[in-house]
Amino acid sequence: MTFPEADILLKSGECAGQTMLDTMEAPGHSRQLLLQLNNQRTKGFLCDVIIVVQNALFRAHKNVLAASSAYLKSLVVHDNLLNLDHDMVSPAVFRLVLDFIYTGRLADGAEAAAAAAVAPGAEPSLGAVLAAASYLQIPDLVALCKKRLKRHGKYCHLRGGGGGGGGYAPYGRPGRGLRAATPVIQACYPSPVGPPPPPAAEPPSGPEAAVNTHCAELYASGPGPAAALCASERRCSPLCGLDLSKKSPPGSAAPERPLAERELPPRPDSPPSAGPAAYKEPPLALPSLPPLPFQKLEEAAPPSDPFRGGSGSPGPEPPGRPDGPSLLYRWMKHEPGLGSYGDELGRERGSPSERCEERGGDAAVSPGGPPLGLAPPPRYPGSLDGPGAGGDGDDYKSSSEETGSSEDPSPPGGHLEGYPCPHLAYGEPESFGDNLYVCIPCGKGFPSSEQLNAHVEAHVEEEEALYGRAEAAEVAAGAAGLGPPFGGGGDKVAGAPGGLGELLRPYRCASCDKSYKDPATLRQHEKTHWLTRPYPCTICGKKFTQRGTMTRHMRSHLGLKPFACDACGMRFTRQYRLTEHMRIHSGEKPYECQVCGGKFAQQRNLISHMKMHAVGGAAGAAGALAGLGGLPGVPGPDGKGKLDFPEGVFAVARLTAEQLSLKQQDKAAAAELLAQTTHFLHDPKVALESLYPLAKFTAELGLSPDKAAEVLSQGAHLAAGPDGRTIDRFSPT
C-alpha cells in the first residue's frame, strides 16, 4: 500500500537536496584566486603586459587589469606595453593602485606611502590615490578613497545649485589647457610687500578644510574671504581648482588680483544665468602644516609667470624665503602648448635650431651672445668649462648617447640637480625615498621627474654649447683668412659660391643646410633635430617620430614576446623568429646544402653544416698539395692509382662532377683549375666559400664542361690521409 503524499514529499526532499548541492560554493575561493594571481604578479609569472610610469616598470596580467579598470581595458587590447601619463599618476601611487587591484584592499599605510611619493609628512595624500583611481576608472577604489576622506572630514562633494543657489557652470570636464595632475606640495609665498602670515596654531576642521571633488577633479579648500559660506554656496569654477596666487597680508593697500579670480570668457554652452561672476574662484587656502625641509630655489621665477601667481608687476622676488611656508596642494597643471610661460620662454630662447643658426654660418657674433670665440657661460654646475670639468668627463661622454625627453623647458639658471622646473612653483624636498627617476646616459638618480627633465635638458644644452664653440672657431678661422687645412684646395676655388665653406666643412647635415669639418661635430649637431621627435624610449632615451616604432624598440629592452605559435604556444620577440619556428611544425626545409644535398629548416643550421664541410675540405686540400709536391702515390691492386680523400674533398668532387659533367680530356686545364681553387682551402674560415666556386673558376678559365677534366683525378700522386676515404678513380658516370 502506497501513500502518494509520502512519495511527493520524498521527491520534493530529493529536489531540495540536489538544489543545495548545486548551490554550494567554496568559501574564500575568490580570495584565494586573487592571492594566487598576486603571487604570480610579484614573481613575474605569466605576466603578459608591462605598464610604464615614468621610469618605473610594472608587470601585470591583462585579464586582471581589464576586469578592474575600464581605462586599462581599452589599452591592453591593442598592446602589451602601456605608457601612463606621469602627470596623472606617479610610480608610488600606481603601486598602491595595482596592489588594490590584486588584493581588493587599500592598506592602512597606503596614505603614508602615497605621501612619501609627494613629500614627507603631507597629510592629505590620499587624494593622490583618488585622482589616480579616477583617471584609471576604478570605481571601487574611488568609492573607498572617498569613504576614507569623508571619515577624516576631508571630503566634501560640491553640488551646483540652481536659481542663484551659487553653483558653477555645468561643465562635464575641464578645458584642454588644464589637466588633473598628481598632487604635489606647493609653497605659496606672499607678495613682496610685508612679511608672511604666521602659521595657524591648530588646523581648523569642518567643511571649510575639506578637499572638494567635481568631475573626477580634486580641489583643496580652506578658510578665506568666503570661509563663512557653505561649500555648496561658494561659486567655485571647475576650471580653476586651487588658488595659486600670492596674497598680500591683511592691511596692505591694493592687493594683487589672484589668478583664480580673473574672469574667463563665457562658454557658448553655459546658461544665461552663468555670468562672469560664476567664473570667479574665491581665494582658498589650506590650514598650515608643520614646516618641511624644502630646498631653496636659487633663482626667482619670472614675474610674468602665471603659475607663480604674479600679476606681471616688475617687482622682484625677495631673496629670503621663510623656513616654514604655508603649503598648498596643486591639482591642476597648465600645458605649455597653450601659451603663457612655455610660449613666452620659447619665444625668448628660440628653438634649438634657431639658436644654432644664430651661432653658425658666417656670422661673427651671435645676437646678444658672447663675443666671437668665447664659449657661453655654463648653465649648470659641472659644465664643460666649469670648475668641475675634470670630474664630469664621463657625463660628457655619456651625453653623446641618446638622451631622454624633456617636456618642460629647462630652468632659467640651468641648475642641474635639486632645481625644480620654474613653472611648477614648488620646492621639492631634498631627499625622500629612493631615487626612482634615473637618467639613462649618465646613471644619476633624482627623486622627481621634474629634476630628471631639468637634468636631461642640461645634457642637450651642453651639446649645443659644444656645437656653438666649434662653429665659432670655424668662423674665426674663415674670417682670419686661413686656407683649408689640406693643401690641395679641392675641386672648387675659394671664390666660388660656397667653395670655402665646403672646403672647411665637408660634412653636411641631412636635415638642414649646415656643414661641419668632422663627423663628430656633425653628430653633435644632428642631436638638436631629435627634439622634434615626440616619442622617447623611457629605457635608453632614444627618440622616435612614431609611437609604433618606439613601442617595437622598447620590446627589445623589456623582453616582450608578442608573437606566439598557434601550435605549441612558444612566444618570440620578432616575426621572422616565429616564421622560422613554424617550419618545425610544417616540416618545411628551404635551405639546401649545395655540397651534399642536405636540407635544413633554419639558415643557421645550414651554416653550421657547411662549416663541417669546410674543415674537411681544408684537410683534404693539405693532403692534395702534399701529393702534388712529389709524395709517392698509392697504387691499387690493378696497378691504377687510388685516390684517398677526406669526406669534404669527396663532396667537392661529387659536386663538380654532377654540375660540370667533367671528363678526362684536358689535363692541363684541369691542373690549372686545381691550382686556381686549392689555395682557398688553406684557411678553414674561407673554406666554406671554396666549396662551390669551382663552376665560377671553370667559366673564368674558358673551359667547357667537356674540357674541365679530372679536377681531382690526379690521384696517382696523392698521399693517403689517416682518416681518408679510398675509392677507385673517379668518373662522372
Curated annotation (Swiss-Prot):
Region called Disordered, residue ranges: 189-209, 241-421
GO biological process: intrinsic apoptotic signaling pathway in response to DNA damage; negative regulation of transcription by RNA polymerase II; negative regulation of Wnt signaling pathway; positive regulation of DNA damage response, signal transduction by p53 class mediator; regulation of DNA-templated transcription; regulation of transcription by RNA polymerase II; Wnt signaling pathway
Annotated localization: Nucleus
Composition skew (Basic and acidic residues), residue ranges: 344-361
Residue numbers carrying Omega-N-methylarginine: R159
Annotated stretches, region: Mediates HDAC-dependent transcriptional repression: 154-315
Domain BTB span(s) in chain numbering: 47-110
Modified residues (N6-acetyllysine): K333
Alphabetical keyword list: Acetylation, Developmental protein, DNA-binding, Isopeptide bond, Metal-binding, Methylation, Nucleus, Phosphoprotein, Repeat, Repressor, Transcription, Transcription regulation, Tumor suppressor, Ubl conjugation, Wnt signaling pathway, Zinc, Zinc-finger
Name by which UniProt lists this protein: Hypermethylated in cancer 1 protein
Source species: Homo sapiens
